[in-house]
Every structure is written in C-alpha cells, then in structure tokens.
C-alpha cells in the first residue's frame, strides 16, 4: 500500500531482518572467525540529544566492514550470556540480551537508511553481499541451544519470579520469537531452516533491487506540451523539472513513482498517454527481462512453505498470523470477504456514473484501468462540485507539516522545534530535523523528515525508528523519521501534493507519534514494536485529523495567495469524504486477498497466472487493478514484514473507525479526555500489553465492523 512502516517487528534482534531478506545460494556463508576492523560507524553515537547518527562520517565502503564488526561483537556478547555460570534469571539473561543488540542496531540503522534512501550501485552490491550474512547471524542466535535453554527457564518461571508485567511480557515475547525462529527444532531441521533463511535473504534483496531498478530507469518522456492538457500547473512544473534533472530540458518526464503517476492518471486528457504511463507503472518487476520477478516470487513462496512445515504449520500464512491479533488466516479472510462484496457493488455504481459522463462527452469507450481516476474526478466534479485540482494549491508540504505539529500538540502535548542549523548531521540535503519536547519542556526525541523522491530511494512512504525509547538503564530518547516520495518543486517554489499524498503524510506521522509517545522500559517493547495488524491503527487514526476544519482552515493555505482554504471548499471535501471508496477498498483488498491466497496455497509455478485466476474467481472488476501487483509487491516479497499480512491495514482500520467514533461521540476530534486515553492505552504502551487489552482499556469495549462500514460509505452493509 502507499504506507510502508519499516521495520515494525522489534524483539531480541530488533534490527536484523532475519526472515525477511531473500537467488538461491549453494551453501551457507563461511563462519565469522574474526571481526573486521571497526569503522566510524561502529562507534557509539555522540553529540547532542543523547547522541545522533554520524551521517556525515558514513562511507559506503565502510558499510560492509562495519556490519561484520558489529555482528562479531554481538555473537560474542550472546555467547557470554549463554555461558553464564549462574542459574538463568531475567537480570542475567533477558536484560543482557536487550543490551547486546545496541551496538549492532546502530550500524544496521545506518546500513538500512542507505539501502532505502541512497541505494546506488555500490550500496546495492553491499546489500547483496550482506543479506545472507545477516540471515546467518540471526540463525546463529536463534539456534543457540544454551541461550534458548536459559530463555526458556525465565519464561517458564516468569509468573513466580517477582517480575513486573512488562518483564513478564518481554520474557514471553523472546521465548515466542525463539520458538518461531526454530530454536526448538532438532539439529537437522535447524540446518535446513538456516539454509532456507540464507536463500530467502538473497531472494528478497534481489526482488527489491529489481523493483527499484525499474522505478529508477523507466519513465515516460513527453515532447509536446499538448500531452500535458488537463494537468494542473504544479504538475506541469514538476514534470519539467524532472525532465531537466534527467538531461531532457524543454520536455516533460513522468517518473515511475506513485506520486508522479497517479496525478497524471487523474488529470491528463490524453488517453493514449494515460495508458502508456499506467502500463509503465503496473509492469514494474514484470517486464520479462533481467528485472522480472516472477521466478524469484516462485522461489520465495516455495521456501516460505518449507519453513512453515518445518515449524509445524500448515502454511506460511498460518505461521505468520500465529502471533497477530487475527490469530488465524481464516479470521483475516472472513473480514476481507465481509468487506469485499459491498466494495465491489460500490465499484459497479462508480463505473456506471463514469460511463454516463463519458457518453455525455461523446467518448465511445469502455472504461479501462487507465481511465478510472480520470473519469472518477469528473464524477466528483458533477456530484459534489469538487475538483481535486482546486484542492492541490492549498496542500503545501511545509504548511501541512505545521498542521501535523499542531495536531501532535493538541492531542499529545508534543511540540516541535527545528534544531539549530548544522547541529545534527543528515544523510541528504533534503532532510530536516526537529526536536520534540513535551508540555513541560522535557526533551522527548528527534524527528527527521525526508519528503522528496530521488534516484536510489525506494518507492512509497514509511517511518523508521533510528533509536527506540527505553529506560531500563537510564532514559534513552527516541529518534524517528518520516520518508516520502513527493515530486519536489523547482528551487524556491513550495511543493504541493494531492489529497491522497496529504493523507499519507498524516498517516506516516501517526507512526512517528507512536514512537515519540512511547513510555516503556525495554527497547524490544518500545514504540511500534507491536503486532503487524495493530501497528497501522495509530497511523490510520491520525489520518482523520487532516480533513478537520481546524487543520484545513489553519494550514491549508493557497500556494500563491496565502489565503486559507475557503469554508465552502472544506464543506465540499466533507460531503465527498466517502467518494470513490469502492475503488480504494477494492484495489487494496485485491492485493490483500492475493497475498493471503498465495501463502495459503501450494506454491505456484506461475505467479502471474495465479494472480489472474484468483482475481477472476473473486469477481475483480475489470476496470481496476490491484494496488500492488505481485511482481512489485515490496510489502510482501522484499521482506517478510507484510507477507500474508497485507490484510493488516483493514484489520487495523476496524479499530481506527471505531476509535474515531469515540471522538465523535465525545463531541469532536479534539476532546481532551479521549485523546488522553488514546495516548495512555495505545500510543505510549508499545508492546507492554496485549493490543486487544490496550484497545479495550481505551474504548471500553471491543470493536465491531459497523464503524468500518460506515466510514467507507457501505452503510447498508453496516446495518
């Protein structure tokens, strides 16, 4: 989906993508026998705010050696814990494990930032070299029998050892993660699982690099200004700037990113160009050449299925959901199927409305996927007298950022101030840094903001925690980032974005606030370290403040006049808030259902055919494509994070819709009592409590699907 949290899973190996990295290796990497020489990246972070990443000292040549040194140091620390002569306790086993990851996590954070934001050929070479070694590190720890035996003792005695509830939960979490990582397998099964993880590590890296190459290299060049007919001036300017940056001055370029493609599909009058841009975008990873991902997908699915069977599960989906809120694939499927029918019915009405407008304009066409956004915008104009091009000039990134800060202050008493220029290193000139304090002036953390697309930056939008909040050995404050791919305006001009991108901006800021509000003892339980189908709840709830009158009137300011968005336009936005929800729900659910069915089925030899057949069986409207087609589905195949778990956005939205009604029932979006409960029971507790219990404490009840159906405009289905 447009939002991508990275990474959400935090436990002993908070920074190791141990099951998520993934072309098949003939053998395991050689054992680590000696540490590489430490580099500047390996040193503890110094400077203000409890230390900050030394981005100004990073050399790509140091990334591999730094990781090697950090991995060796972590293995040594783990070996010492496993060999401790005293009987296992929380203090001599679990807490030392929390310490053991810190040095490695600092290095892996920098490595991950370069891989996500600055992935040139040199960085990608390091990724290919290090992916299997990182997987090997994780296996060495999870399969350390002496270490697991100690963790098991602490886990089994957790309720009688005088541990706090948070300590008991951490003991449970570590034991659960070790079992899920193969710690309880016999020797031969452990070897097989390690071999599987090696192959998955390289395959997933290959998948993501193929997608990134297609996104970097593919583009549509427009030579004639007539091809820009219908586009707002801001998009024409951005396309001209993109062309100039690629040595095509005097022309216009549509880049292969969602923030460039979707506005073009919405406004461009030239149907043939819309089709060309659409086909470029949906063909990422599916071009039949060196970057084609279909064989890689088949290999990943086969390996995941083998691993699940080794661990005693029927399918990868059953293994994946064991520790989720949904618990089983069947429960996740039931929710998706409940929503699918009403959403498809809504799409049929949306298409009928489009057909009427097309016919009235004399267009004798059948609505195709590259027409949907274009004619949907015309329907919006007809039904609601609302044209999104009217809204875009009011959606300046910098002003919306201030609106997010206002939201954080009103809800959670968090206040943002830019750090003194040059006081905190950044990894790219586009990045800005803000100090966050609470209402008493106490330092809470730093927020890094990297809003613009660039070559080498993966697509989408995401939040990272560079450092987690913790306090079991003194207070450690968090460092979080939000990263987006907005098309940057020419120098000196404000960048404006679409309504959908503005919603994404607030969504990702919700993830950042989840990290900034964290108030826990142990880093493995901190911030966003929660179940995958819960982690999207704090982010999705924050989206609801964007369309509030206070945010729009105060921060949606016209890019030329500086005047606030007119009240009449705000009213139109409110009236049209459920417009096109059929399309949005179906394109998401199609991706989520294909993801789940891929991981419930016998691995397919032809992912493209599986996708087509599954969508046909579901009754997928021909006018829509999946939001993420399988060959570029980074959520699912560039790592394990959202595999068999893309449904999580819908599961979380059940909570989101119900939680928003808590505000409306209390009188409005700024109700202080509801906001206090939201912070106390959701945003601040991390993974210290079961998410179902945390939600119940906030809301006073369990959620149902009625609020979700009302939110999406499927009122009849909600009754």
Model-derived features: where do they sit?
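N-terminal secretory signal peptides that target proteins for export/translocation
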Residues: 1-11
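Bacterial N-terminal signal peptides
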Residues: 11-30
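N-terminal helix-rich structural modules
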Residues: 22, 36-237, 663, 719
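C-terminal, non-catalytic "cap/extension" segments appended to globular domains
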Residues: 37-60, 69, 229-230, 251-253, ...
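Short His/Asp/Glu-rich catalytic/ion-coordination signatures at enzyme active sites or charged loops
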Residues: 47-62, 111-130, 153-195, 255-295, ...
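Intrinsically disordered or highly flexible coil/loop and linker segments, enriched in small
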Residues: 72, 76, 80-87, 103-120, ...
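Active-site-proximal, well-structured secondary-structure segments within enzyme catalytic domains
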Residues: 166, 170, 202, 209, ...
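Short pre-active-site segment immediately N-terminal to the catalytic Zn-binding motif
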Residues: 487-506
